[in-house]
Swiss-Prot record:
The gene is Klf16. InterPro entries: Znf_C2H2_sf, Znf_C2H2_type. It comes from Mus musculus. Keywords: DNA-binding, Metal-binding, Nucleus, Phosphoprotein, Repeat, Transcription, Transcription regulation, Zinc, Zinc-finger. Its main location: nucleus. This is Krueppel-like factor 16. High expression in brain; olfactory tubercle, olfactory bulb, nucleus accumbens, striatum, hippocampal CA1 region, amygdala, dentate gyrus and frontal cortex. Moderate expression in hippocampal CA2-3 regions, piriform cortex, septum, and distinct thalamic nuclei. Low expression in the cerebellum. Residues 48-72, 95-125, 201-251 are annotated as: Disordered. GO terms for cellular component: nucleus. One of its GO terms (biological process) is regulation of transcription by RNA polymerase II. It comes from the Eukaryota. GO terms for molecular function: DNA binding; DNA-binding transcription factor activity; DNA-binding transcription repressor activity, RNA polymerase II-specific; RNA polymerase II cis-regulatory region sequence-specific DNA binding; zinc ion binding.
Length: 251
């Protein structure tokens, strides 16, 4: 096995040296009449000891065909593709830029570029050890929270006087704590109502005739249109009392 690998490496090195010195393909004289076209071909490649290209009488280097972007392929890119074919690795493609240069782009790296923002090669390595559960997570903290659904552990206890409730997650405890304090962190952008939970706000805001989903993503936007606040008044929200008109002067 090692001898085969050494043979492949030697052949690859020989190919690289032939490319760097400028391989030349000569076409021999036409063969005798009636012979096929292959009879007159004489393919020769310059060796390591070939005459340098700058000396008189040296054959000109072969012209490379222009690629799709108009730029000629560099010898090291051709050598890289030959080595990739020999070793069975990914083929390196070239993307032509507007300035006329080329930059190597690996097809495997382009295929593995994540669209979700995670680092390449990230995987859900934290798997649930419980039998019959195939869930996996990117972070160990997420797995730890999931394990509590199996064990029934609730480490987050409410410290409000007279309340003995416990929760498996800290965000559940924080949401429950607002039921004691009366804090309503989610205001409706179309009326004066506020809510302790965001899902309650979404359910309420959809009842407005002028509701748009983007309004919930802009917390300072408010509308004073009476038609927008009509569903809130129907639901029991306080309506402003009419302002009495001033009495005529002289009475």
């Amino acid at each position: 096995m090692s001898a085969a690998v050494a043979c492949v490496d030697y052949f690859a090195a020989d190919v690289l040296m032939a490319i760097s010195s400028g391989a030349v393909v000569h076409r021999g004289r036409p063969g005798p009449e009636g012979a096929g076209p292959a009879a007159g071909l004489d393919v020769r490649a310059t060796r390591r000891e070939a005459t340098p290209p700058g000396t008189p009488g040296a054959p000109p280097p072969p012209a490379t065909a222009p690629g799709p972007g108009g730029a000629t392929a560099a010898p090291h890119l051709l050598a890289a593709s030959i080595l990739a074919d020999l070793r069975g690795g990914p083929v390196v493609a070239t993307a032509a830029s507007t300035a006329g240069g080329t930059s190597p782009v690996s097809s495997s790296s382009a295929a593995s570029s994540p669209s979700s923002g995670r680092a390449p090669g990230a995987a859900k390595s934290h798997r649930c050890p419980f039998h019959g559960c195939a869930k996996a997570y990117y972070k160990s903290s997420h797995l730890k929270s999931h394990l509590r659904t199996h064990t029934g552990e609730r480490p987050f206890a409410c410290d409000w006087p007279g309340c003995d409730k416990k929760f498996a997650r800290s965000d559940e405890l924080a949401r429950h704590h607002r039921t004691h304090t009366g804090e309503k962190r989610f205001p409706c952008p179309l009326c004066t109502k506020r809510f302790t939970r965001s899902d309650h706000l979404t359910k309420h805001a959809r009842r407005h005739p002028g509701f748009r989903p983007e309004l919930l993503r802009r917390p300072g936007a408010r509308s004073v249109s009476p038609s927008d606040s009509l569903p809130c008044s129907l639901a029991g929200s306080p309506t402003p009392s009419p302002v009495p008109s001033p009495a005529p002067a002289g009475l």
